[in-house]
Amino acid sequence: MPDGRALVYSMRGALWKQTLGTTVATQLTAGGGYDYQPDVSPDGKWVVFDRYDGNALELELLDLSTGKVTSLTGNHAANLDPRWSPDGRRIAFVSTSYAGRWHVYTMDVHDGRGANPKRITTDRDSKLPRYYYSVYDHYLSPTWSPDGKELLVVSNRNHIWGTGGFWRMRAEPGDSMRPVHDEETTWKARPDWSPDGTRVVYSSYLGTQYNQLWLMRSDGGDPLELTYGAFDATSPRWSRDARHIAYISNEGGNTSLWVLDMPGTAKHRVEARTRTYLEPVGTLSIAVTDQAGRAMDARVSITGADGRSWAPSTALMHADDSFDRSERHFEVGYYHTSGASTLTVPAGTYTVQVTRGLEYAVGTRTVAVSARGVRSLRIALHRMVDL
């Protein structure tokens, strides 16, 4: 938030708000898709975000005073990485609406409505023999200069490998791009321009197998590493006073939200121990055993009637993208269990599927969870063959 006292972030496919120094998170959105990549407007009244509905990634606008959500795009493309301009009048974002290629756009936003989307990056055939990317250059992760005149973007222009380096350009259609820092980045780079305009923070795996946070001057130069360790640190965002950087890390296991003090190395984890939900919820407890009742390690997939997947708050959810959209709306989400797991879900009907390698038959159950109710489910796996 603009006052630096709270964060808006994505968790469990919804947007949440949490005051720093507390452990209470309040849910802001609850829709039929997955909501993520929020960005709060400079006046603190609006949140632009991405909603994945199973067929497209569309930009949405949340009115924080009313909770109303309004669609900004409806082009059935991949629209992502939305960022407010410093004056709150425009949004920069990435879209595949032109020829299915990744380009940076700007859109005017006034009184909760979007208008006049413009593609500002140039469609360019690089002629390069790229191994896993198109010959056409792509443009990702725009971030605004504090004066609102320029954008810094990630592009693979002149690169064969990786998502590319960092480039600056005026926030106008067809403007030339100036290289700032040449590096073989990944999609996790996600740079953010500092409020004073002198620095850019980003994530990189430079010289290591882990993504860490790095700091560079906005006009180029050698970067400085900010975080160290056998973990990943990604998605950095400056606070408005430039005294803190919020980021995502798997330090300690599961992904979680952290805040790094600037300057310095002090950091702390933001924990949501208490959650205030928008809709009625219940508790689902699942026990996985063999036929003798002994707890078993297994893979668990829990799918709601709307096709979304659910997992315990302490579990790392994985996504299996090998699916047929004519059969299901979203990817199959799953987590691993040592035998017992408990999660909070919106009231409704769920399909629980449990697998354990090729030796055991798949266990499937349908269960209804009522508001404020507790539902316990035991699935005993049948061993078909001993390999």
Question: Which residues are covered by each model-predicted region?
Answer:
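A flexible loop/linker signature enriched in serine peptidases of the S9 family
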Residues: V8-W16, L20, T29-D35, V48-L61, ...
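A short, solvent-exposed beta-strand micro-motif common in secreted/extracellular proteins
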Residues: V300, S326-R328, V332-G333, A347-G357
